[in-house]
């Protein structure tokens, strides 16, 4: 093999996952490798179309390397030579159940979370609860902000506040000129917190209660309000991976 071909060939990293020998390109995460091998790992904040954030921790797995074993988020952990991965042990199931219980404490009415909880054997309501004024269906996964910035290119929404007051909102908590009304944020929301509804002949984007006049959409060049969004924003953007991640 010539030096040029050798340099161009991707480096394959051998490792073990659930007792199986495997090898993937350098830089592949444990989650990506597992999905390619048909191993199911639940996720909420992960989407192939955008950068990894590692917010929900539902995809936790057990990794052993260098004589050390620990739990870690599979979406952010790159495979390495000699790595041993386990995706379904009692400790992992216990950790995932705790994650879902904590998410349900903040978002007790989120149907997708309830479905994941049922699959993991978690009873609802759980052991924990936020104060009613701090409860809503947003789990702070950041998918809406990431897709708005990285795919749409608008960067119209972002995180604000800290701690239990953290929220994803438009800048200055009001509709911004940066928003083009494509509703891609609605498409990727894993808990259906973001919705678009027609109120008194005005389209309002919940949960931000924002409305806007008609403007030209930079995606299709058509004139539309924030309410008249594209039925399939993922298809319009030319990507097919904006499905909601609900196991």
Question: What label would you give each PLM region?
Answer:
Residues 68-181, 192-247:
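Fe-S ferredoxin-like electron-transfer domains
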Residues 184:
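A short, cysteine/histidine-rich metal-binding "knuckle" motif
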Residues 188-189:
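A structural motif detector for beta-strand N-caps
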Residues 1-123:
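Signature of N-terminal electron-transfer/Fe-S-associated modules in redox systems
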């Amino acid at each position: 093999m010539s030096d040029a071909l050798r340099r161009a060939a991707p480096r394959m990293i051998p490792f073990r996952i659930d007792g199986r020998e495997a090898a993937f390109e350098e830089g592949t995460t444990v989650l990506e490798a597992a999905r390619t091998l048909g191993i199911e790992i639940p996720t909420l904040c992960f989407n192939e179309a955008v950068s990894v954030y590692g917010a929900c921790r539902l995809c936790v797995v057990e990794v052993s390397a260098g004589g050390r074993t620990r739990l870690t988020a599979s979406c952010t952990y790159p495979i390495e030579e000699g790595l041993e991965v386990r995706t379904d042990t009692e400790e992992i199931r216990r950790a995932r159940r705790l994650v879902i219980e904590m998410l349900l404490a903040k978002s007790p009415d989120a149907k997708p979370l309830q479905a994941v909880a049922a699959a993991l054997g978690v009873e609802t309501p759980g052991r924990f609860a936020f104060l009613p004024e701090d409860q809503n269906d947003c789990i702070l996964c950041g998918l809406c902000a990431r897709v708005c910035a990285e795919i749409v290119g608008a960067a119209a929404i972002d995180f604000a506040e800290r701690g239990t007051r953290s929220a994803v909102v438009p800048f200055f908590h009001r509709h911004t000129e940066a928003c083009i009304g494509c509703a891609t944020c609605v498409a990727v929301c894993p808990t259906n917190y973001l919705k678009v509804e027609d109120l008194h002949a005005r389209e309002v984007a919940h949960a931000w209660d924002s409305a806007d006049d008609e403007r030209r959409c930079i995606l299709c060049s058509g004139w539309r309000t924030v309410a008249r969004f594209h039925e399939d924003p993922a298809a319009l953007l030319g990507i097919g991976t904006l499905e909601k991640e609900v196991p």
